[in-house]
Amino acid sequence: MASSENEPFCVKFIKSPENSEYFFKAYEAIKQIQSDESLQLTEEREALLLKEKDKSLYICDPFSGAAFSHLKKLGCRIVGPQVVIFCMENQRRVPRAEYPVYNMAMADVTISCTSLDKETREDVHHYVQIMGGCVYRDLNVSVTHLIAGEVGSKKYLVAASLEKPILLPSWVKELWEKSNQRIIRYSDVNMTEYLCPIFRGCTICVTGLSSLDRKEVQRLTALHGGEYTGQLKMNESTHLIVQEAKGQKYECARKWNVHCISVQWFFDSIEKGFCQDETMYKIEPASTIKSVPDTSTPTGGNSKPNSRTLYDVSQISNISTSCVNESAFNSAMASRLDPPADTLENLDISSLQAPDDLLDGCRIYLCGFGGRKLDKLRKLINNGGGVRFNQLTGDVTHIIVGETDEELKQFLNKTQHRPYVLTVKWLLDSFAKGHLQPEEIYFHSSYQQTEMPSPFEPAINLTANKMSSTRDPLNHTRNHQADEDLLSQYTENNSTLIEDEHPKTSNTNSISQMSMHEDMTTCTSQSGLADTSTIIEGGLFSRKQFMVLGFLEEDEACIIDIIKKSAGKVLSSQKRAIADYAVVPLLGCEVESTVGEVVTNAWLGMCIEQEKLLDPHSNALFTPVPFLEGSTPLRECVLSVSQFMGAERDSLVYLAGLLGAKVQEFFVRKANPKKGMFASTHLVLKDAEGSKYEAAKKWNLPAVTMNWLLQCARTGRKADEDSYLVDNVPEEDKDESFISQTYKPQAIRLSMHAPCHLENHPEALTKAAVTPLDMNRFKSKAFQSVISQHNKNPQTSGGESKVLQREPSLHLDTPSKFLSKDKLFKPSFDVKDALAALETPGGPNQKNRTQSTPLSEVIGRNLQLAIANSTRQTAAVTASPQLKAAEKKEFDNSKLLINVVICVSKKLIKKQGELNGIAASLGAEYRWCFDESVTHFIYHGRQNDMSREYKSVKERSGIYIVSEHWLFACSEQQKRVPEALYPHTYNPKMSLDISAVQDGSYTASKFSADTSLQQDENSELQLQQNNKFGETSDDQVKKAAGDGNPQNPSKDVKGALTQTLEMRENFQRQLQEFMSATSVVKPRGSVGRAGFDNSPCTPEGARSTRNGRSRVLEALRQSRQAMTDLNTEPSQNEQIIWDDPTAREERAKLVSNLQWPDSPSQYSEQLQHNMNDAGGNYTPAKESLTDTEIAELEACEFEPKSAMRTPVIENNLQSPTKPDHLTPTPQAPSIAFPLANPPVAPQPREKPVQPFSKEETLKERRFQLSSLDPQERIDYSQLIEELGGVVIEKQCFDPSCTHIVVGHPLRNEKYLASMAAGKWVLHRSYLEACRAAKRFIQEEDYEWGSMSILSAVTNINPQQRMLAEAAMRWRKKLQGIKQNMGIAEGAFSGWKVILNVDQTKEPGFKRLLQSGGAKVFAGHSSPLFKEASHLFADFSKLKPDEPRVNVAEAAAQGVNCLKPEYIADYLMKELPPPMNNYCLPDAIPYVRVTGTGLSRKRKTSGDVSDVKRSRHY
């Protein structure tokens, strides 16, 4: 049997009695493709005769026995049968490994190990190699997974930073065990269960933390795989969390080389998901940190290098003065605002009686407190119903500061939404007076407040409180400036003199209008005026010269500091040089010098915020605002400003305050004096979107643009809101730029006393300079031929002549204006005529067509793409003015995808440029990297793709993940097609070509809207008819209303019918071909298919759910589309000829599942099937349906019923219409299978509406709201009251409530108590459905736990799902008992409970138990044991001096002595959990194991009915 070198390759199967079924399956598979000479079935004894290694491939199964060991010893190439099957199925080579490979479960996996003992590491290596994986000793870029025994090694930190999965060795063992049972891949095992815990191998000790923080660290450590110890032990403790670098533990830890880190390390590790590098959080002794003594003498270590050329001039005399005065100011402010130290220390909390919801909506972070002070403040916040945060996040609304903190300053400098930074006196005064105090008078002195909370004050002057105490620093500034003037005589020419000799105009508008990201608190004491000779190259204002005029001295110093930090140069007013910009207050001031542009501090602030130089004329707030002094036309108005941020928002708030208006953050309909809210009268915003805008429309309150405010300021009178509604803003008015920067006036003089001079500028100031387009620059012959033909035709259109009449008014600049050596010349071209020349000449139906020649389409798209790119790259340079189009078109290519922002996946990187170009030509924006502004993610992959990029995008709600073909379809069809038709799994070769059918229905629907609207002037009433019979988009309605040319109805209808019938034949032909390839019987029960012709057509383009359209019908359409998961994407017309069995089965499934989106009968069948399916196995088309869509699953039934009561639609489209009736929208013929008989409209399936019983109608509905946003609370509270309900505003559960509306199921008191009492626990979509029906409706389909809610809301975790199901289960159970027995039961009925828990938690437990019908004893004395049935105790939370119950004595008398966790688990789990698992340690000896887990007292109690006992089974 010894093989020679010339022996051919052979596959040998080693036969043994233990061979598995895979062995014979692999043999048969190879036998089909391998010749008999190269395939052998060998016995074990023959294999043992082999003397040396040969070239054969040996197939062994199992990897054991004498033959396997012999072959392995010789070094033969051995694989298992699973390897053969895997490689044949995946067309891969059999691995040439130096070791046997049993299966390919870990193919494509490369692992490296860290922190494992030698034996475990060798086991891991062995199993990985035997499963087809690769092993590296060192960590490199090829490694895909890291196997770790514990955290903290260098490999661990590098792998975590590279986001590589870090797993436990048990993952490899689990893969090996499962791969022995069946053929699997490593991805089939859930890796999340085997991820290395964050603190694996860490033994953590703490010092200096409060008791509550210590317990929190202990809990989280155990939760994340670490070990917590109270004592610091040598060779055991690995980490010591230190509050301050002192103490015995700290000193010992340093000696024993234990990591001494801050508590931030602990929480950052949890937040980022892996153990952080300890060196970044190391706590050093104070002596090593502070090595420089506190002296007034400047040293190199704590002062910035002086950039001036004269180094021998000392300025030391000025520094000490500023330091002393700044200290005096700080101490004065602190003494005024902060309470004495002993006030909080000696405060008796019990003396402060305040409402439970005093702090409702306040999210509070405590900073700079410790010990007893911190505990008292926590109790105050809990008692007042506030939410306390342990970490600084963007959700915090109030920060209460004790001692100053540098980390807090850094957070405030970075955050966009600054919370209130207050002293503790605000909290104490609020509790003492029983209502929230205004925050303005409690600002902390050490932290600057940039928001403007009160509209009554013109602005919060940053330094208003400093004026009386900082006179000396101001004098120092003047002296300092005098020194600068002296030194400037000897410096270079680029230094700048700053003088304050010209008179300042006092103005109430201070620098606080701007949202500055710089820290301005030291701009007066440590001003940067000495650095005026330094130019920071490449800064925002590099090579720009400024003048600062009209501000108070301290504000001026701050503005100068801001400009210089951005590389700008500041000139004095007496300098002869011409400044580029003069910065003035918002209302302007007199400018004597010659400057290029006069801008406001709002312009400066927004330039800093956006980090780019903005066009001064792109925003009305960038130039001085005309204001009629002394007028307050908005005295009775309460404004809310939305969608504006930073300096722009502050300026609007300031302006509104000057006009007499009140400005508040929340937009409310009713006043709430308790919370200091007024009833809003106006909403000022940018765009017609957002929750506040929807609320304004609902409440009929004006939603206006900021131009309304500017007009009020300009005229001194309240302007008409209808002229400034945000709905009426045309698209061309939304452009940012108004005046080209190429034109700059030589001198502009603005007077504070005559602000109306802005209106007297010449026309050149309001019209941009246009560079005419040179037609000779286009070399294309096709383009030149089109232009030449266009020039020969006389212009007859009135619209075009209008445009041409405007040409002579162009103001062209001479080359000396724009050909400057310091400025880049960027011309703008007027290409309107060129694009118009490419359009197809208009016909009789031109307004309904957008067809053009292929050549013009290509050229037009490329021109638009070039213009879009040019505009994007030159944002600072304004383009030519947009002239009105000669002929209004129904569609504009550049606005098809307006407000769409796309990002292309890395998988499609090669197509990214092409896809971005298509998107830009359709009016969309694109991003090279995914960010928060992206609305559509272009991706291609499988249904459950495991790529990190896909999962990260999928976690974000509201993002469309679509195929690249969606963009192609939008471009081809010249409309925004529905995203649901093009998911990321879309394959054009695997779908039917039915897109044309949708176009047909769209045309017919549009025609119906046109004709019916022309017959009746009441467009609003007709719109309601369209919503019922053929929902028409808003754009179509507007088009029809404005169309003055009469149409030919019969001609269009016949054309639509002919086109649709052709589509029907084509569609039918495809289906017949599919059906001929399969033997699947056509599904029965689809009687309603004959009713296609009368089914409502829903064009996908109509997306608005509030503007004249039923939100119920819209959400039903979307939700049904998601639930049935229709595969109706447009595709190419390809057919399969080869008879593949798998493909035939798939075609059969496609035919059986194929349904038309416009057929209500088929939809109802599929929906009914899905709703009745207990498993609920359907895949939603998107991550989670919106609340409104969920609401429509049931509420939509009202709309079809109302439609059925209206006059029946005639089948004959040509029939005359009675003049006294509105013409209903005719329906487009649908595509259906040919029927022998004429189509008959089926009777719609009506779900019988159960009328409310008399008792239910009369019963008052009392609601509680939980886990909702503040704006949602306000909106839903208003809705409930309008419908006749009552809203209970309590922080805790109220037994009188009948319904609780919950955002998300949480294991809190409100939710559990509602569950125990059998209340209705509803999703917020219930209220949306009630809003649509305008009355309270049945609750069943909107209850947490119902299939309609759980199937639609997919982003809940298992615990939330268990809570949701438990709520419905208890509600049904308790209501059933009430109906059958006539008695009101609770979940805890019959319980008699003794509580021995923490005093702060006892009221909550008591309310929870009592809501479920339990009787709770006051106290826990021994005589109560005879009556009690349950005792709940938690000694770990009790203080040493608090009394404790005698558990042993209670258990001896038959009381169930349990941990409090039993209460929640009893409610959540379907079967009551065994009491033995929750038994207190002292009661274990007395537990008698019974079938029900009940004690003797419960078993023998005669007063407990069978109904009560049945709950335990």
From Swiss-Prot:
Biased composition (Polar residues): 789-799
UniProt main location, coarse: nucleus
InterPro entries: BRCT_dom, BRCT_dom_sf, BRCT_TopBP1_rpt8, Secretoglobin_sf, TopBP1-like_BRCT0, TopBP1_BRCT_1
Compartments in which it is found: Nucleus; Chromosome; Cytoplasm, Cytoskeleton, Microtubule organizing center, Centrosome; Cytoplasm, Cytoskeleton, Spindle pole
Domain of life, per lineage: Eukaryota
PTM entry text: Phosphorylation at Ser-1131 is essential for phosphorylation of chek1, and thus for checkpoint regulation.
Domain BRCT: 101-189, 194-283, 354-444, 530-621, 629-726, 892-984, 1253-1344, 1383-1480
Keywords annotated in UniProt: Cell cycle, Chromosome, Cytoplasm, Cytoskeleton, DNA damage, DNA repair, DNA replication, DNA-binding, Nucleus, Phosphoprotein, Repeat
One Pfam family in the UniProt entry: BRCT_TopB1_SLF1
Impact upon substituting residue 1131 to E: Phosphomimic. Exhibits minor defects in checkpoint activation
GO annotations of cellular component type: centrosome; chromatin; cytoplasm; nucleus; site of double-strand break; spindle pole
Region (Disordered): 289-308, 789-809, 1031-1053, 1086-1109
Subunit: Interacts with cdc45. Interacts (via BRCT domains) with ticrr; interaction is cdk2-dependent. Interacts with atr in the presence of atrip. Interacts with recql4 (via N-terminus). Interacts with gmnc. Interacts with cip2a; forming the CIP2A-TOPBP1 complex.
Similarity field: Belongs to the TOPBP1 family.
Name of the protein this chain belongs to: DNA topoisomerase 2-binding protein 1-A
Organism: Xenopus laevis
Top-level taxonomy: Eukaryota, Metazoa, Chordata, Craniata, Vertebrata
